[in-house]
Amino acid sequence: MSDGRAIPSADRAADLALWIVVAAGCALFVLRPTLTGRAWTPQVLLAGYAMLGLVAASAPVARPTGRSMHPIVVAAAGVVAVVAAAAAVGPSVPLPRTAEVLALNSVAAVAEELFFRRLTYGSLLRFGTLAAIVGSAVAFALVHVPIYGTAAIPVDLGAGLVFSWQRWASGGWGAPAATHVFANLVAVLR
């Protein structure tokens, strides 16, 4: 197909491998809380984020047929949404305000956006734009349950929907990654 929504491959093994990578990536994100509190935690998380980001960046996924808004405009809209949400939601999860925490949260945001907005969204595009937006947002919200609990599902789903909208509106994963980094920094620093 040449409509820009389907991966141009008749190879079912490649499709299966792609879905295995998506499932394995979700499992890695879900298991993050089991790694906390150890001396080697930052190094393991950084290595995991780097590996997942590289796989997500290099996997063959559907490319959008066009974008409707400039990525900077889309990122700016995301920043406005983050500021409004931070004002409305109240206190965040208490995290240490160290350079290590800020850096690791920023790297995590980029890896998550590569994974959810490039790989997962791109994989779901074959089922339509709505499936890609909602599916990647729901997966994003669910992998955060082990860290923040079920009470955070509405916030994480809302964030995932904003990031997925940004992916659709800009045609790429850069605007949602910039917004996600900003959101993580706001969460740690406020």
Predicted regions and their residues:
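Alpha-helical phosphate/pyrophosphate-handling elements in metalloenzyme active cores
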Residues: A77-V89
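Transmembrane helix-loop-helix hairpins at the membrane interface
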Residues: A87, P91-R190
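Short hydrophobic alpha-helical membrane-embedded segments
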Residues: D15-G25, V74-G78, T129-A137, A152-L157
